[in-house]
């Protein structure tokens, strides 16, 4: 799905990423790498191959877009270092894109790990009229791209049936990104007037008519 914001074009992909066409930037939020290994360490029966699924999905998205830069909108790594960092380190050596991290609340590992991989780190980034943060933020004259919330939407069906989907949640001056990572869950938001919801299905991103 392609949307236009402030005369710039963005392709919203069902992976939960967005490609900024004019800047050749791929925007991704909330990978939470390391979370699967953390759960496995504490006895949860999650298949080890699930660790590699995030990287397979990343490669799939990179194959679709001519991205020169990847900006992670926070919570790239879940908490303490574990063996998933080695997978991530190896993955970065297979790509050519410039990597940037906007720090999130879970990004607590030493910055040296990132600098060793030539990943730039910022608390926020301003590009033209766009403010890129992890936590939702409002600033006059800027449109905010952010994550943190892991937005989802519940759609009512027949009777008591509901369909729950991750989504891009758009407010007049903000777009909240869904979580990219596996096993991260959703926080279900209730749209207000002038909000727009772009729900993620297995095949595409679709705008939900809220009226």
Q: Whereabouts are the PLM-identified features?
A:
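Extended recognition/assembly regions associated with phosphoester-bond processing machinery
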Residues: 1-73, 78-211
């Amino acid at each position: 799905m392609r949307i236009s914001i402030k005369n710039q074009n963005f392709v919203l992909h069902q992976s939960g990423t967005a490609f900024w066409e004019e800047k050749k930037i791929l925007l991704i939020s909330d990978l939470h790498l390391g979370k699967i290994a953390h759960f496995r360490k504490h006895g949860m029966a999650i298949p080890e191959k699930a660790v590699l699924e995030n990287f397979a999905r990343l490669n799939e998205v990179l194959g679709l877009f001519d991205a020169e830069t990847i900006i992670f909108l926070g919570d790239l790594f879940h908490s303490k270092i574990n063996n998933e960092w080695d997978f991530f380190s190896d993955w970065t050596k297979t790509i050519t894109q410039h990597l940037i991290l906007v720090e999130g609340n879970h990004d607590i590992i030493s910055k040296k790990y990132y600098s060793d991989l030539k990943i730039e780190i910022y608390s926020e980034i301003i590009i033209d009229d766009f403010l890129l943060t992890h936590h939702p933020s409002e600033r006059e004259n800027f449109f905010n791209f952010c994550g943190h919330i892991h937005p989802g939407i519940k759609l009512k069906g027949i009777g008591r049936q509901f369909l729950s989907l991750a989504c891009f949640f758009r407010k007049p001056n903000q777009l909240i990104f869904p979580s990219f990572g596996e096993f991260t869950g959703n926080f279900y938001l209730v749209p207000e007037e002038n909000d727009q919801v772009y729900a993620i299905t297995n095949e595409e991103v679709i705008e939900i008519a809220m009226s």
